[in-house]
Amino acid sequence: MLLLTLALLSAPSDSAVSAVVRDIQVAPGEVLRTTSRGTGEPLVLIPGIFGAAYGYRRITGPLVALGFRTIVIEPLGYGFSSHPKKADYSFTAQTVRISNALDQLGVKQALFVAQSSGAAIAFRLAILRPDLVRGLLSIDGGPAESAATPGMKKAFKFGGMITKFAVDESKLRHDVRKEIVRNSGDTTWVTDAVVRGYTAGQTADMSGSIDAFQRMSKSKETDSLASRLHQLEVPVRLMVGTVSHPSEVTSDQRELLSEKLPDFKTESVQGSGQYIQEEQPTAVVAAVTELDKASR
């Protein structure tokens, strides 16, 4: 732990680590934004809907310093990836796209870190393409069965056109900030600059983003993730914040993972909410280090 702490203290900031941004076409009109740093062993990070690569800025530098090549992949409709109006935004379709992007990047047997809804994609990827995944760390993200959450469905109850009239950049930032605060333990990290960073991909294409969100609200999965979790054989670690928050991983989801996965552990992070990589980044880096050892 002392060596890890020293590494973190001496790690370059995210902005100081040279980034390679590559937009990868995975299908006609479907482009995924990838951001890579470092040259070591591959570590793939999948964000939630908001945040993009920016949401991992506090851990990518330290992880590169520890010898990893970090690769943030933003799923379709997330962050700066494209927001096609008629695409399939189911988690299953997103999983296929992520695997396509990784194939084009030449990545195999990577560690994965996924936050929030990104974890639902990562779970499926580890089942669909075990050759790509050697270990998975979920940051407060459970085995969600659908991208069409009750909140999404409610937001688009009256259709996307009305939403476009009601939501501008300022309104989006306000709503995202409110949700981040509700789902955080220590909220001091939630500044105006951070909220702008978390929403930059969406505000760059407001109309397209709203179209994508509406499609997510109507997405359907072809089969159940719960019925296939037993096929996931790599080590899986779940980090959860101890501060109660609306988007937390439910007790039923935790029990399901514990029952179905052969190598599963949960770590509770005191004082944190959903955004552990923001509130306690050193805990996430330490968890990645332990996962790296367990997956060899």
Located regions from the model:
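Conserved HGGG/HGGXW glycine-rich cap/lid loop of the alpha/beta-hydrolase fold
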Residues: 30, 35-80
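Conserved alpha/beta-hydrolase catalytic His-Asp/Glu region
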Residues: 148-153, 167-230
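Short glycine-enriched nucleophile-adjacent loop
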Residues: 119-130, 136
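Conserved loop-alpha-helix segment in the C-terminal half of the alpha/beta-hydrolase fold
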Residues: 236-272
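Catalytic active-site module of serine/aspartate enzymes centered on a nucleophile-bearing elbow/loop
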Residues: 261-296
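Flexible "cap/lid" loop of the alpha/beta hydrolase fold
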Residues: 127, 136-167
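Short N-terminal helix/helix-N-cap motif within the alpha/beta-hydrolase-1
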Residues: 53-61, 80-83, 147, 247-248, ...
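Active-site loop/oxyanion-hole signature of alpha/beta-hydrolase fold enzymes
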Residues: 17, 27-30, 35, 75-117, ...
